[in-house]
């Protein structure tokens, strides 16, 4: 391209002084036209598009270069004569990067800016619009303000602003070269600082992050609270609240985007804090001099919005509104001018209020039973009854367990009945049988009777004595499932004594009772009658006595007036009264 244009040296045309003014005016007019084409007004959009199309066509014509340098000179002469302008090169002054934009010199840019500012001022009338230079000068001021805010606010809780600068050569924007600040409206608040809303989570890279909850436990919570109360007096609280409030201009457009509910909540919170500060001042500045914890909180009804969910009867009390943060009368320092009367009144009042709190729970449980054994959920705990031997003992007690093992082994061996070859079965029942053992029976039978008699004597508390007629005693054993569950020892007697009836008022079973001195004739005396504990209430004792009455004397059935009981226990007395159908049954002394 350059080879075709530079073989010859071009001649410089001299210009007259008269033509200088015309050339300068043409240059300024052409520059103004270019500025108007580059920055069209909103009313001249259609004209601008047509002009752009014409310029594109002219540029396309200019790109077709002439074949010889002579023609280029001729074309330049024609253009100079017609347009009365300076030298125009063959190549159009198109920007290197974009073919649609023209390159402008610094002087041309300055003229365009001045012309553009004048045109915008004339179109808008009295409303001045800041130019690009003015906006550039205002930028450092905005950054300074933001830097000051960063010092006062933490980086986490600072509101996010998007700095958007409109492009100067954008064809669609009606107002170019303007700097706009659009705040990012969060879900809750954007204009007010985050310190007034501690519940709102902080944002990091436009993402919500829940702050880690740290609870001060123990004495650290109260120590920190006291230090804060000492450092910050109560009179300075409303001033601090006013300082913490953000400075919002009256004509700011961002204030319109704030929901009304947030403003109402903020006002109500400020009023509640002011009411708390007033109540705390009343605690300290009491005219009587005595520190009295006033629990009355005077709040205006208009401070809170009415809601349908709240009942009309419910009144707002200081206990319902964070009682932890109320200043207690004990922690506050008393003034130096406090009188002795006020101090006594304060102590008396505090004693009256703290009486129910100082009551110890242990004092109320003094009348209850003392727990001597720790109940840790053991399976075997407390008093238990052995199902096989019937002994009552305390589990988890080593002494009782040892005694239980000894008694259990001895008892099971004593009541165990294997069976004999020659059994003297006196009566048979569906649940067992009764076996009679005489003194002349084999030794294994007599030995078994002695073992059972020893167990019976231990359980009944009977003295081991020698009977009057050992050769005539008869032992009746009730056998059930190869075990001895009942035993009756009978012996012949000659006389017995009648038990005197007691008044109906005292029907308690006691060992001491009275009997008559007049003896009565009797034939059979029942020295011992015993039934296994787990087999009682099954008519075993009754069947044993019936068998004795039938078998004690051959060919004779004894009546209830011919049998007597020897020193019965309370249970034996009830049984004798029930069996004989009278409390005046016969008893005898087996020692005689």
From Swiss-Prot:
A zinc finger (CCHH-type) spans 384-408. The keyword Acyltransferase applies. Its EC number is 2.3.1.-. It is an enzyme of class 2 (transferase). Its main location: nucleus. One of its GO terms (cellular component) is nucleoplasm. GO terms for biological process: chromosome segregation; double-strand break repair; hematopoietic progenitor cell differentiation; protein localization to chromatin; regulation of DNA replication. It catalyses: L-lysyl-[protein] + acetyl-CoA = N(6)-acetyl-L-lysyl-[protein] + CoA + H(+). The modification Phosphoserine is found at residues 41, 85, 309. Keywords: Acyltransferase, Cell cycle, Chromosome, Metal-binding, Nucleus, Phosphoprotein, Transferase, Zinc, Zinc-finger. GO terms for molecular function: acetyltransferase activity; L-lysine N-acetyltransferase activity, acting on acetyl phosphate as donor; protein-lysine-acetyltransferase activity; zinc ion binding. It comes from the Eukaryota. It is found in: Nucleus; Chromosome. The keyword rRNA-binding does not apply. Residues 267-294 are annotated as: Disordered. Belongs to the acetyltransferase family. ECO subfamily. The N-terminal region seems to be responsible for association with chromosomes, thus excluding any involvement of the Zn finger in this process. Acetyltransferase required for the establishment of sister chromatid cohesion. Couples the processes of cohesion and DNA replication to ensure that only sister chromatids become paired together. In contrast to the structural cohesins, the deposition and establishment factors are required only during the S phase. Acetylates the cohesin component SMC3. This is N-acetyltransferase ESCO2. The lineage of its organism: Eukaryota, Metazoa, Chordata, Craniata, Vertebrata. The gene is Esco2.
């Amino acid at each position: 391209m350059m080879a075709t244009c530079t073989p010859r040296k071009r001649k410089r045309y001299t210009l007259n002084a008269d033509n200088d003014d015309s050339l300068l005016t043409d240059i300024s007019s052409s520059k103004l036209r270019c500025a108007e084409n580059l920055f069209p007004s909103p009313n001249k959009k259609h004209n601008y598009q047509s002009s752009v199309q014409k310029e594109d066509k002219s540029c396309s014509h200019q790109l077709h270069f002439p074949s010889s340098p002579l023609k280029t000179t001729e074309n330049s002469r024609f253009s100079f004569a017609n347009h009365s302008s300076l030298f125009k090169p063959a190549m159009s002054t198109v920007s290197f990067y974009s073919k649609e934009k023209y390159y402008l010199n610094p002087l041309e840019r300055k003229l365009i800016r001045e012309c553009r500012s004048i045109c915008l001022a004339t179109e808008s009338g009295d409303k001045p619009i800041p130019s690009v230079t003015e906006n550039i000068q205002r930028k450092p001021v905005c950054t300074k303000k933001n830097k000051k805010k960063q010092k006062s606010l933490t980086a986490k809780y600072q509101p996010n602003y998007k700095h958007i600068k409109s492009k100067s050569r954008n064809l669609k924007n009606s107002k170019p070269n303007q700097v706009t600040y659009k705040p990012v409206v969060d879900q809750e608040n954007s204009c007010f600082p985050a310190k007034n809303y501690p519940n709102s989570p902080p944002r990091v890279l436009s993402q919500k992050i829940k702050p880690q909850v740290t609870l001060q436990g123990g004495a650290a919570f109260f120590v920190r609270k006291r230090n804060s109360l000492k450092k910050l007096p109560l009179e300075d609280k409303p001033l601090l609240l006013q300082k913490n409030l953000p400075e919002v201009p009256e004509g700011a457009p961002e204030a319109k985007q704030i929901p009304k509910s947030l403003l109402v909540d903020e006002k109500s919170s400020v009023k509640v804090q002011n009411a708390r500060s007033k109540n705390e001042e009343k605690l300290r500045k009491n005219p009587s001099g005595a520190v009295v914890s006033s629990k009355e909180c005077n709040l205006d009804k208009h401070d809170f919005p009415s809601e349908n969910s709240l009942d009309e009867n419910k009144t707002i009390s200081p206990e319902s509104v964070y009682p932890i943060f109320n200043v207690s009368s004990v922690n506050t320092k008393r003034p130096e001018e406090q009188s002795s009367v006020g101090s006594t009144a304060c102590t008396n009042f505090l004693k009256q209020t703290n009486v129910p709190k100082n009551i110890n729970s242990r004092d109320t449980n003094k009348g209850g039973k003392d727990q001597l054994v720790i109940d840790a959920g053991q399976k075997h705990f407390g008093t238990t009854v052995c199902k096989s031997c019937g002994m009552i003992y305390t589990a988890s007690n080593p002494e009782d367990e040892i005694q239980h093992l000894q008694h259990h082994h001895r008892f099971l061996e004593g009541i165990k009945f294997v069976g004999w070859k020659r059994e003297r079965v006196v009566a048979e029942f569906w649940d067992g049988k009764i076996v009679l053992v005489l003194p002349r029976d084999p030794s294994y039978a007599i030995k078994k009777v002695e073992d059972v008699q020893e167990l019976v004597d231990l359980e009944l508390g009977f003295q081991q004595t020698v009977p009057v007629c050992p050769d005539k005693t008869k032992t009746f054993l009730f056998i059930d499932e190869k075990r001895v569950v009942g035993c009756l020892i009978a012996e012949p007697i000659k006389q017995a004594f009648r038990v005197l009836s007691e008044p109906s008022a005292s029907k308690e079973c006691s060992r001491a009772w009275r009997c008559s001195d007049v003896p009565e004739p009797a034939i059979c005396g029942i020295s011992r009658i015993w039934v296994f504990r787990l087999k009682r209430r099954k008519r075993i004792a009754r069947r044993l006595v019936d068998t004795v009455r039938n078998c004690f004397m051959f060919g004779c059935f004894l009546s209830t007036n011919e049998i007597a009981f020897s020193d019965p226990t309370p249970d034996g007395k009830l049984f004798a009264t029930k069996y004989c159908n009278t409390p005046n049954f016969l008893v005898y002394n087996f020692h005689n």
